[in-house]
């Protein structure tokens, strides 16, 4: 929508990657801002009355986008909307948000709570987050043929694909509260919180990383393409899917390629480095070499 740009000053650097937007305060300071929610994972949380990881989902959806701009989180605000505030639900979500903020050295400085019984029913609610960070002063590194593509493992489905998951549960009449999958409660598997990648990638690491891609809605390929120049050729090898994807495949006819267009498929963050920096990352837990720029 072009009319939005009419509100911009010359300090707005834009949102070229589509992950977070940049605003140049002065020659030394560039701020980045991101906003997101947890989608229909909130509906499952309400049905299961399981909220302890949902605040981390919210913070991670914003902070992982911010990381793609090589920014360090500064402060976070939340928005909570419901029919009426229920103490356990509200408190557990806020505690989870607070805990996640502390994990990435970010301050929860405020928020808004809205009670709207005409819009929300029963236990249902929605949450949104707003995060501001400061961009680290790193050189822009050009992507070249032979560069290596690394993936960092996800922690389950993160916060995307839940409309699809809920549809599977409904059509197959699965009792989500009692179902067991791979020797654990299915509800526990499905509600794992989104990983906070600022905990795994340091400011020093960013000196060697050319681009980062947060793998969210739309899956692996579409999100990866957002972080590289149009027309860049690459080879990605997504070989073995995590066990939780057997739950999807056992209950609906879907190909692995179709899964990569919806889910993170076990990879929550992708980044590119020069091959000479291979040894700096390959031995790390959760890090895997998954491809190459061709």
Model-based region annotation:
Residues 12, 21-23, 64-65, 98, ...:
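A generic local secondary-structure boundary/capping motif
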Residues 37-39, 79-87, 112-118, 133-136, ...:
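Acidic, glycine-rich active-site loops and adjacent beta-strand->loop/helix elements
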Residues 49, 82-88, 148-156, 185-191:
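Flexible, glycine/proline-enriched loop segments at strand-loop-helix junctions
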């Amino acid at each position: 929508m072009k009319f939005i740009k009419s509100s911009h000053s010359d300090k707005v650097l834009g949102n070229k990657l589509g992950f977070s937007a940049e605003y140049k305060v002065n020659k030394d300071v560039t701020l980045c801002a991101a906003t997101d929610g947890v989608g229909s994972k909130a509906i499952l949380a309400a049905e299961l009355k399981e909220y302890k990881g949902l605040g981390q989902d919210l913070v991670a959806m914003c902070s992982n986008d911010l990381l793609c701009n090589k920014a360090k989180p500064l402060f976070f605000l939340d928005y909570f909307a419901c029919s009426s505030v229920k103490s356990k639900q509200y408190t557990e979500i806020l505690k989870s948000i607070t805990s996640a903020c502390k994990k990435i050295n970010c301050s929860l400085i405020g928020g808004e709570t809205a009670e709207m019984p005409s819009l929300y029913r029963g236990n249902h609610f929605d949450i949104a987050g707003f995060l501001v960070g400061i961009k680290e002063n790193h050189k822009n590194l050009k992507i070249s043929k032979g560069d290596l593509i690394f993936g960092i493992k996800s922690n389950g489905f993160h916060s995307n694909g839940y409309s699809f998951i809920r549809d599977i549960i409904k059509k197959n009449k699965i009792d989500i509260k009692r179902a067991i999958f791979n020797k654990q409660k299915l509800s526990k598997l499905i509600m794992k919180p989104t990983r906070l990648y600022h905990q795994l990638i340091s400011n020093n690491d960013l000196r060697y990383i050319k681009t980062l891609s947060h793998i969210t809605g739309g899956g692996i390929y579409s999100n990866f393409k957002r972080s590289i120049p149009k027309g860049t050729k690459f080879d990605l090898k997504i070989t073995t899917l995590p066990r939780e994807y057997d739950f999807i495949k056992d209950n609906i006819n879907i190909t692995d390629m179709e899964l990569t267009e919806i889910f993170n498929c076990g990879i929550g963050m992708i980044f590119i480095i020069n091959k000479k920096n291979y040894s700096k990352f390959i031995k790390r837990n959760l890090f895997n070499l998954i491809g190459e720029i061709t």
